[in-house]
Curated annotation (Swiss-Prot):
Alphabetical list of Gene3D superfamilies matching this protein: 6.10.140.1430
Main localization category: nucleus
Keyword Nucleotidyltransferase attributed: no
Gene Ontology CC annotations of this record: nucleus
Name of protein: Late embryogenesis abundant protein 17
Similarity annotation: Belongs to the LEA type 4 family.
Native source species: Oryza sativa subsp. japonica
Coiled-coil features, chain-numbered ranges: 3-52
Expression induction or repression: Induced by abscisic acid (ABA), salt stress and dehydration.
Primary gene name: LEA17
Length: 344
């Protein structure tokens, strides 16, 4: 705003300077024209005076050179009269020219004085007008500047108030949103905790029930496996005894199937005990633990079978040797007799 006022004042000063220069140029032109007119009039006066002086000097010379008497004197008198007339004529012209020159000079001085007064008045009026315009412009600028300052201050206050109101509203909204968010978060946290606790309790109860069921099933499976193992072992022992008895009878009669047949019978018995046949197809008991139990039962049954077989074999061999010794003196003709091979 200050720069705008400065520009306006500078323009006003420039306009005032241009007006003063125009006035000075006009005054100089008029003064120069008056001076030219005065010089022309002076030149006319000087020429008229020179002409008149030359005529007077010619008349005096003619008067002194002429002699007296007669026609010559008459001529001289006529010439003198003519010169006098000319002199009077030129004197009137000179007076008229001098008067005209004086009048012209006076008129020129008057015009110049009037022009100077006019120029001074115009300059004063121009200066007064410029000063008045400058003052009015300065006053208007100050008023505008004051109004603009007041307007700017009002707008600034309004803007500050609006910004403060917006900030307060935003702060309140943020606080409300934050409170709502905190409440929602706390509610969600409580719900999550309750759900987690409930899920944990349910999971714990489920795990406990599952563990109990697993323990019960394991115990039941172990009992079943133990019973099955016991039955299998007993059955294997019975089969072993039956097989041994059958083998002995077959050996005595020469109709037995041998050790491989007996082993196959015992193996079939163990396999039959370790499988369940509710229908036409065999269904093995499931589960890794059950399978391991069945394998251990089969191994134990096989061990019992082989132990029982070895015991029975040793008993039967001892019985055969005793029978062989009782029947023959030099030795048993049977190729399996132990004492024929130096084993006695």
């Amino acid at each position: 705003m200050a720069s705008r006022q400065d520009r306006r004042e500078a323009r006003a000063e420039a306009d005032a300077r241009r007006a003063a220069e125009e006035i000075a140029r006009a005054r100089d032109e008029r003064v120069m024209q008056a001076e030219v007119d005065a010089r022309s009039a002076a030149d006319e006066i000087a020429r008229a005076r020179a002409d008149r002086g030359a005529a007077t000097m010619g008349a005096d010379t003619a008067h002194h050179a002429a002699g007296g008497g007669g026609i010559l004197e008459s001529v001289q008198e006529g010439a003198k009269s003519f010169v006098s007339a000319v002199g009077r004529t030129f004197g009137g012209a000179r007076d008229t020219a001098a008067e005209k020159t004086s009048q012209t000079a006076d008129a020129t001085r008057d015009k110049l004085g009037e022009y100077k007064d006019y120029t001074a008045d115009k300059a004063r009026e121009t200066n007064d007008s410029v000063a008045r315009k400058t003052n009015e412009t300065a006053d208007a600028s100050r008023d505008k500047l004051g109004e603009y300052k007041d307007y700017t201050a009002d707008k600034t206050r309004e803007t500050k108030d609006a910004v403060a109101q917006k900030a307060s509203d935003a702060s309140e909204a943020t606080k409300n949103k934050l409170g709502e968010y905190k409440d929602a978060l706390a509610r969600k946290t409580r719900d999550a905790k309750d759900t987690t606790a409930q899920k944990a309790t349910e999971f714990k109860d489920g795990v406990k029930a599952t563990a109990q069921e697993t323990r019960d099933a394991t115990a039941d499976t172990a009992r079943k496996a133990k019973d099955a193992t016991k039955d299998t072992t007993q059955t294997a022992a019975d089969k072993a005894r039956e097989t041994a008895a059958t083998h002995d009878d077959a050996t005595d009669k020469g109709q037995g199937q041998g050790l491989l047949g007996a082993l196959g019978n015992v193996t079939g018995a163990i396999k039959e005990k370790l499988t369940v046949s509710p229908a036409a197809t065999q269904e093995h008991l499931g589960g890794g633990e059950e399978r391991a139990v069945k394998e251990r039962a089969a191994e134990k049954a096989a061990s019992v079978y082989f132990e029982e077989k070895d015991r029975l074999t040793r008993e039967r061999a001892a019985e055969r040797v005793d029978k062989c010794v009782e029947k023959c003196v030099e030795g048993c003709p049977d190729a399996t007799c132990a004492h024929r091979h130096g084993k006695m």
